[in-house]
Amino acid sequence: MLDTKFDELMDFPCAFPFKVVGEAHETLTDKVVAVVQKHAPGDYSPSTKTSSKGSYHSITIRVTVTSKDHIEILYTELAAIEGVRRVL
């Protein structure tokens, strides 16, 4: 797992925003929601912004997380989506 201190800084469960930056592709948002649904089923309405040149999408999604491990798993799996450049 990742070496983070989320467990020291946060009280769980809590809403946690993930920002996924990836290549502009029409299915990127659906892929992000699918990964989140796998680990935290719910009703999600992510916001999407397109870069000035249209090359990248930035998707922000708020997820109710239950532990440090839950956050780390989501970071790892979101980063593994094809075309994703960063997960913040």
Curated annotation (Swiss-Prot):
Xref: Pfam families: DUF493
Family, per entry: Belongs to the UPF0250 family.
Organism: Shewanella baltica (strain OS155 / ATCC BAA-1091)
UniProt superkingdom: Bacteria
Highest classification ranks of the organism: Bacteria, Pseudomonadati, Pseudomonadota, Gammaproteobacteria, Alteromonadales
PANTHER family assigned to the protein according to its UniProt record, in alphabetical order: UPF0250 PROTEIN YBED (PTHR38036:SF1)
Xref: InterPro entries: UPF0250_YbeD-like (IPR007454), YbeD-like_sf (IPR027471)
SUPFAM superfamilies: YbeD/HP0495-like
GO CC entries: cytosol
The name this protein goes by in its record: UPF0250 protein Sbal_3280
Signal peptide: none
